[in-house]
């Protein structure tokens, strides 16, 4: 009896080769990109439903970061957007090591020419000039080409007597271009001052994230400043500020809701309502003259 109790267990060994040859004929395959996990609530979302809902989680309302193509799709009347200045090429004025290669790699990966796309389109039949920043391109950092494209768009808006809408999404000035990137803050701000002198409307829509030199310049110069829900908006990072002033900062003090509460922005607009709100603001401005 004891001999049977402590006898060695026998196992069947299956080689890895045999496992690899085993085919699960009835196992369904799920194509890549069909399901997306919400990074806020953890819900697994069907990609097609998410796109129909403006890339917003239907459970918690989390606004996913979106790029230029999605913005154009959700904002403009169909087939009315015309891109400007897409041939302007990014240079390496400081001969920063690896910068040229990095730019080319990101261009191939994102199919974008730079961190901002500018152009003209129609919202509810009304023409507007728009600049859309995309955080997928070097975190939407502002270099000389970004500043040049936005400035040209504003100058063209003055010529055409059209309102300007800028969607911000940026980590700030591009370090690889040094002082030239910081110059773009003043350059764009100067162009916006001329737009203001002409009595033309400038609406800024702050999206997640809007930080650094972009926040310190044109992001906060709008006649009307809108923001998407729960967007990160600030200049320096929270930890940097806390270490500098040696004080604990309020929770979510760099979120759009906090900024609205303290009078830094005019309104928080869910993405699904943005086109309607912008159309109303543009129409009101046009009818005031």
Swiss-Prot record:
Main location: cytoplasm
Domain CoA carboxyltransferase N-terminal: 34-289
Keywords, in A-Z order: ATP-binding, Cytoplasm, Fatty acid biosynthesis, Fatty acid metabolism, Lipid biosynthesis, Lipid metabolism, Metal-binding, Nucleotide-binding, Transferase, Zinc, Zinc-finger
GO biological process per UniProt: fatty acid biosynthetic process; malonyl-CoA biosynthetic process
Pfam families reported for this sequence: Carboxyl_trans, Zn_ribbon_ACC
Cellular component annotations (GO), alphabetically ordered: acetyl-CoA carboxylase complex
This enzyme's EC code(s): 2.1.3.15
Protein name: Acetyl-coenzyme A carboxylase carboxyl transferase subunit beta
């Amino acid at each position: 009896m004891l001999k049977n109790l402590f006898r060695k267990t026998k196992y069947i060994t299956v080689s890895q080769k045999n496992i690899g040859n085993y085919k699960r004929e009835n196992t369904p395959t799920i194509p890549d990109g069909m399901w997306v996990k919400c990074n806020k609530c953890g819900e697994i979302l069907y990609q097609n439903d998410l796109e129909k809902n403006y890339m917003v989680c239907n459970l918690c309302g989390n606004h996913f970061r979106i790029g230029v193509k999605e913005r154009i799709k959700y904002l403009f009347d169909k087939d009315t957007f015309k891109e400007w200045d897409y041939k302007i090429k990014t240079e390496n004025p400081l001969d920063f090591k690896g910068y040229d290669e990095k730019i080319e790699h990101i261009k191939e990966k994102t199919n974008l020419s730079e961190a901002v796309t500018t152009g003209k389109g129609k919202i509810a039949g009304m023409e507007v000039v728009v600049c859309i920043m995309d955080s997928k391109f070097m975190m939407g950092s502002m270099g000389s080409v970004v500043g040049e494209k936005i400035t040209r768009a504003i100058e063209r808006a003055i010529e055409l007597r059209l309102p300007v809408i800028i969607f911000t999404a940026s980590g700030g000035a591009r370090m690889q271009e040094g002082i030239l990137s910081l110059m773009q803050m003043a350059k764009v701000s100067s162009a916006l001052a001329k737009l203001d002198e002409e009595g033309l409307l400038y609406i800024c829509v702050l999206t997640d994230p809007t930080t650094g030199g972009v926040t310190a310049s044109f992001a906060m110069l709008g006649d009307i400043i809108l923001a998407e829900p729960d967007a990160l908006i600030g200049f320096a990072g929270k930890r940097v500020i806390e270490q500098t002033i040696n004080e604990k900062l309020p929770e979510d003090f760099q979120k759009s809701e906090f900024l609205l509460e303290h009078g830094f922005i005019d309104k928080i607009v869910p993405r699904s309502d943005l086109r309607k709100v912008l159309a109303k603001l543009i129409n009101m401005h046009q009818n005031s003259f």
